[in-house]
Amino acid sequence: MLDLTYEAPKPKVIAGAKHDWELVIGMEIHAQVSSNAKLFSGASTTFGAEPNSNVSFVDCAMPGMLPVINEFCVAQAVRTGLGLKAQINLVSAFDRKNYFYPDLPQGYQISQLYHPIVGEGEVLVELAPGIARLVRIERIHLEQDAGKSIHDMDPNLSFVDFNRTGVALMEIVSRPDIRGPEEAAAYVAKLRQILRYLGTCDGNMQNGNLRADVNVSVCRPGQYEKYQETQDFSHLGTRCEIKNMNSMRFIQQAIDYEARRQIAILEDGGKVVQETRLYDPDKGETRSMRSKEEAHDYRYFPDPDLLPLEIEQGWVDEIAASMPELPDAKKARFMADYGVTDYDANVLTAELDAAAYFEEVARGRDGKQAANWVINELFGRLNKQGLTIADTPVKAGQLGGVLDLIASGEISGKMAKDLFEILWTEGGDPAEVAAARGMKQVTDTGAIETAVDEIIAANPAQVEKAKANPKLAGWFVGQVIKATGGKANPAAVNQIVAQKLGL
């Protein structure tokens, strides 16, 4: 396995009117567990269903209804913890987080404050070749999602859809290790990539299946190092939380605005108030939502309806044995086995389906050539037409067939691109299509020699120029390929032209 080592990036420095400042960011990612049923009921989790059609008596808090833990959701949380190199707690417990909101029918949320199912882990976030930030994970806990309030159906009424109520969430809490807006977006992207590889969350931010709460503070240069020495959070400044971010771009914009807002307050001699804020993408600014609550504000206490959750190490080991190859390991293997560059390996492993496609194309073939075709031709065409790898009309076997025809010398690179275009629009077997369209490269040296002789005989002045300047021999190569309808093998033409001209 290729050994990949990284250097930590420098923190983002923002110049204020009076001083330089550094950013400190911690994140809480709410990832919806990929499961057909909710955390404590058997109701469906299908997105987009008719309002209030996926609701059980447990979800809407009918009297006497008791929650029953969904074992699959627990397994998904364990799998996620293992994927983040985290400690799996064999004993965890559920607590009630008490607050009132119209779309929370119980009047409390079942969560895990005191004894989460997953402890400390880490995520390596690559920012550039050889540059990466190691972000520590503090904990992962399971909790229920709330419902959805709808305010735009009637000017005088609000409606509630309980379909999402009780859906399992994993809250993934990071340490304040992120040091800039770009790092924050890269962290979310890397975490989403890992979750998708694991199959524990689909990472669909548009549907709200992955949401981020972003904690932002600013401090003077050198203060972060004091925090690292003492673990005293006061060195990091007063943080504000930006809630429910569901876009990488908005995350970066919100952090940048919030940092400058806090800097302006501090440089004017004021104090930053710890609070929860919302980002308004239309105005490009954050606004106050409410004062930031502490744990005691929610009156947490152990849920009396749920026993402590005890799992066996053997069960954890079974899950560990079924773990897929994760992005970092796959990237290192692609670089080692197929000789692709760091950049290409990142592109090829960004999505699990894309990595599988590439590997099918590259297996037994030139890895660099396969990467070039997959990234430039296939991905380029998919991006242009707004398609995903699952929608591609050119399957891996077909693209592999094109590369085989190139390798055997039957078609040239230009012919291969024309063949790819035909396969994209019409489909078919590459070898059969190439044969039917007469897309066969001329490799017969006798035929090529005849064409070269004719071109040389017709252009004596050009011959003298080429003998004086060998670089001009390329003109003859182009003329021969043109004369053969683009079918002559360029390498063979080059060799014969050089021989005939005595170069």
UniProtKB/Swiss-Prot annotation:
Enzyme Commission (EC) number: 6.3.5.-
Q: Keywords in alphabetical order, please.
A: ATP-binding, Ligase, Nucleotide-binding, Protein biosynthesis
Gene Ontology molecular function: asparaginyl-tRNA synthase (glutamine-hydrolyzing) activity; ATP binding; glutaminyl-tRNA synthase (glutamine-hydrolyzing) activity
> Could you give a single Gene Ontology term from the biological process aspect?
glutaminyl-tRNAGln biosynthesis via transamidation
Enzyme class comes to: ligase
Q: Does this entry carry the keyword Protein biosynthesis? A: yes
The keyword Ribonucleoprotein appears for this protein: no
Q: Per the record, what are the reactions this protein catalyses?
A: L-glutamyl-tRNA(Gln) + L-glutamine + ATP + H2O = L-glutaminyl-tRNA(Gln) + L-glutamate + ADP + phosphate + H(+); L-aspartyl-tRNA(Asn) + L-glutamine + ATP + H2O = L-asparaginyl-tRNA(Asn) + L-glutamate + ADP + phosphate + 2 H(+)
- What family does the entry list? Belongs to the GatB/GatE family. GatB subfamily.
Q: Which PANTHER family match?
A: GLUTAMYL-TRNA GLN AMIDOTRANSFERASE SUBUNIT B MITOCHONDRIAL AND PROKARYOTIC PET112-RELATED, GLUTAMYL-TRNA(GLN) AMIDOTRANSFERASE SUBUNIT B, MITOCHONDRIAL
Q: How does it assemble?
A: Heterotrimer of A, B and C subunits.
Role: Allows the formation of correctly charged Asn-tRNA(Asn) or Gln-tRNA(Gln) through the transamidation of misacylated Asp-tRNA(Asn) or Glu-tRNA(Gln) in organisms which lack either or both of asparaginyl-tRNA or glutaminyl-tRNA synthetases. The reaction takes place in the presence of glutamine and ATP through an activated phospho-Asp-tRNA(Asn) or phospho-Glu-tRNA(Gln).
Q: What is this protein called?
A: Aspartyl/glutamyl-tRNA(Asn/Gln) amidotransferase subunit B
